[in-house]
Amino acid sequence: MLPKLLTSIFGSRNERLLKQYRRVVERINALEVQFETLGDDELRGKTAEFRQRIAAGTTLDDLLPEAYAVVREGGKRALKMRHFDVQLIGGMTLHNGKIAEMRTGEGKTLMATLPVYLNALTGKGVHVVTVNDYLARRDAEWMARLYNFLGMTVGINLPNMSREEKQAAYAADITYGTNNEYGFDYLRDNMVYEVVDRVQRPLNYAIVDEVDSILIDEARTPLIISGQAEDQTDLYLRINAVIPQLAKQIGEADPRTGEGVIQAGDFTADEKTHQVFLTEDGHEKAESLLAQAGLLAEGASLYDAANITLVHHLYASLRAHHLFHRDQHYVVQNGEVIIVDEFTGRLMSGRRWSDGLHQAVEAKEGVNIQAENQTLASITFQNYFRMYAKLGGMTGTADTEAYEFQEIYGLETVVIPPNRPTIRRDELDLVYKTDREKYDAVTADIRECYERGQPVLVGTTSIENSERVSELLNKAGLPHQVLNAKQHAREAEIIAQAGRPKMVTIATNMAGRGTDIVLGGNVEKQVQLLEADASVPEVDKAARIQTLKDEWQGLHEQVVALGGLRIIATERHESRRIDNQLRGRAGRQGDPGSSRFYLSLEDSLMRIFAGDRVKAIMERLKMPDGEAIEAGIVTRSIESAQRKVEARNFDVRKQLLEYDDVSNDQRKVIYSQRNEILEQTDVDAQIAHLRRGAMTDVVRTYVPAESVEEQWELATLESTLRDEWQLDVPLRAVVDKSDAMSDEDVVERVVTAANDAFDAKLAQVGREQFASFERMILLQSIDTHWREHLAALDYLRQGIHLRGYAQKNPKQEYKREAFELFSQLLDRVKLDVTRVLMTVRIQSREEAAQAAEAIEVRAEQISNVTYTHPNEDGSVSQDAAAASAAEGLPLQQGLRVGRNDPCPCGSGKKYKQCHGKLA
């Protein structure tokens, strides 16, 4: 009661905002006469003037009245269209980072030019986001006439464009594109190996058209880039044939005496650390065997830069043969290797070991070696669009989802009043017992409209229902058009003519979006075709255009007299918003129109949520077959059911976001560090930091922190450093000579030895030449382990709900385990990068450059790349990559995290002490 009383006194939040905006509209209107007197060049010159004022410190808010007045005047001259006052209000709403709800036909496309122009003055770029390629191209080409007139550049971002074309599109003041393409470009930008290969600039300001469709309907499906690394089946098989010829050494040699080996061999296997190491003799034998197998050039070393991957596969195969045992670590079922959980003994179907180990086990067992299809990168629309410094949206239907927009995106919804009052008549729903009765009534209504000449738009919830209605109309002899949201350009032309007399158009909810249905048909298209027709003499064009307009005026008046466009819906959608979108197709800009929903108790929504209640009412009223119930209580009951579904879907999306936020925090860290590495020419500091961490970890395995000498395993540590890291550090001799050597001293001695060995390598090759190789190794390692981490997170997510049965909170468990997995990822990167750089043999500067280039080429050799994304109709598509996409197209830098800022993972530690370790 109290909120209603306060609203009646002070007005609603929406009314107060509109009142505030109307005061600015008065200032814009006052400037109109002044700008009308300016010449075209003077008006265009305002753009340069505004930019100078911004550089001098003027804010966009201060410029807004003048900038909007300039755009309005430019629209009158370039487009022959004048922005209404309500469009100015909508433009202010978008500029303030809110969602503008404007009814269909009120001119959202033209409205967007106001905030787009104003924000583009900063030179930081503005992205206009549409639901499909057709609308992106149409709106860009249409509005470019205005932007170009005012001295602004416009780019279009479409799939299949080359990297250079995309860079040009993003470099423009204003860029039009689809939500999917912007997101994929972001992901691809964070997969490149050179800064110059990125296409996006930092994300500044975006206006999302059909914001409800993009940020709500499509939010449950993340954008995923997946692909297969180059097929190496033959490599695994040939290495697998070499392994039985290598003998395992039994016993560990004492570094000082060489004693302790019971049986000499080619490699040692450490069950404790699950690692294998080739002995010196083993190196020579392995090189000889690999040369015989045609995998290694005669006289080449395993540790040459060109053979880094060969060493990796050799060790994976040795581990598969000697450390992973059938029916203990895995089982073979139906020709597949399935991992056994070492703690529970359960089979882990779908899980695969990383680092090529799984393929090595498959080769060992003689089963089919699966070319692993990895997720290369992934992001949800929620997390992508929240990265923009400012975000605005527009749609005809947002108010029903206002809470979700505010809760998830922090976007307030402002309902913009129509330019003219709406006089559309929304009739009560008609509910029938069966589908057959419902469709009979639909056909009868369509026939009645057709016979009197009134245009009809039949809305369906699926392609299947569209085809069913089409079949019924064919049987009834009623001509019609069917649109299924597949061919956007063609369907836009058809829907534009859906307002002509006797037109019957069947369309799924999404078909023809973004195109107005004008009563009497769309004469503008015909006029454009006539103006472009070179065969018609110029002197005749004006007369023929006037004839077309006169004919249209007659048709328009005829349709208005018949009651305007009739909307017939065959089913209620789960969301009231989608139903409102369909209704909004009629009654544009004060035109007449009517709408009615035909339902049956067999409809899915009715059957699940409202059927019993309505059925009871029908039985109580003893309704005969073919008779419909029409009552406000029934419509309210159905809307109540829709609210339940909307609430459930909101919970699903919110839960998805809570889980994705975990990986999103980690994504920010990885992408931020990746971009730092890309932008630096010298990564010595990072490499040195990783080397110290790796050497410390190695030492701590055998010399625990704060331990005494009796607990140290120095002999094993020395052999590990020699075999795995190619470091000869005589620790035992040093310890024996020292009176008081601590475990920290051992760490420092090993770190110093590693630094000295690395510096010697740099001196031989040259620091500058080796820097590029270091950078490539670091990037490749991050990318490889990040992909494996994404797969591990996906696997964790699939089964985490089962923790609820153990009285544990699944979300908390997911956060905890995801944090552990991420820590392991950083450790693996640290060890891998250090191991490669310590053991690789590069003799010259040329060899270093060739090795860096080879790594970059190999990293981009991802085959069968697919792009998974949601469609407008709610389905999910997997598209094969375009050639340009396979090149590794780019995106913007990830959000930067300061070294002393709190870590985004939520641990409470500083970033540099937590997940900033790589930097």
Swiss-Prot record:
Classify the protein's membrane topology as the record does. Answer: Peripheral membrane protein
Assigned GO CC terms: cell envelope Sec protein transport complex; cytosol; plasma membrane
Q: Biological process (GO) annotations?
A: intracellular protein transmembrane transport; protein import; protein targeting; protein transport by the Sec complex
Keyword terms, alphabetized: ATP-binding, Cell inner membrane, Cell membrane, Cytoplasm, Membrane, Metal-binding, Nucleotide-binding, Protein transport, Translocase, Translocation, Transport, Zinc
UniProt-annotated location(s): Cell inner membrane; Cytoplasm
The yes or no answer to whether the keyword Cell membrane is present is yes
Q: What EC number(s) does its UniProt record assign? A: 7.4.2.8
The free-text note explaining how the cofactor binds reads:
May bind 1 zinc ion per subunit.
For activity, the cofactor(s) needed are: Zn(2+)
Family matches, as SUPFAM superfamilies: Helical scaffold and wing domains of SecA, P-loop containing nucleoside triphosphate hydrolases, Pre-protein crosslinking domain of SecA
Annotated residues for binding of Zn(2+)? 903, 905, 914-915
**Is Cytoplasm there in the keyword field?**
yes
Q: Name one GO molecular function term.
A: protein-exporting ATPase activity
**CDD domains, per database record:** DEXDc_SecA (cd17928), SF2_C_secA (cd18803)
- Give the binding site residues for ATP: 87, 105-109, 516
Q: Which reaction does it catalyse?
A: ATP + H2O + cellular proteinSide 1 = ADP + phosphate + cellular proteinSide 2
Stated role: Part of the Sec protein translocase complex. Interacts with the SecYEG preprotein conducting channel. Has a central role in coupling the hydrolysis of ATP to the transfer of proteins into and across the cell membrane, serving both as a receptor for the preprotein-SecB complex and as an ATP-driven molecular motor driving the stepwise translocation of polypeptide chains across the membrane.
User: Quaternary arrangement and interactors, per the entry?
Assistant: Monomer and homodimer. Part of the essential Sec protein translocation apparatus which comprises SecA, SecYEG and auxiliary proteins SecDF-YajC and YidC.
The family line of this record is: Belongs to the SecA family.
Q: What is the name of this protein?
A: Protein translocase subunit SecA
- Gene name for this UniProt entry: secA
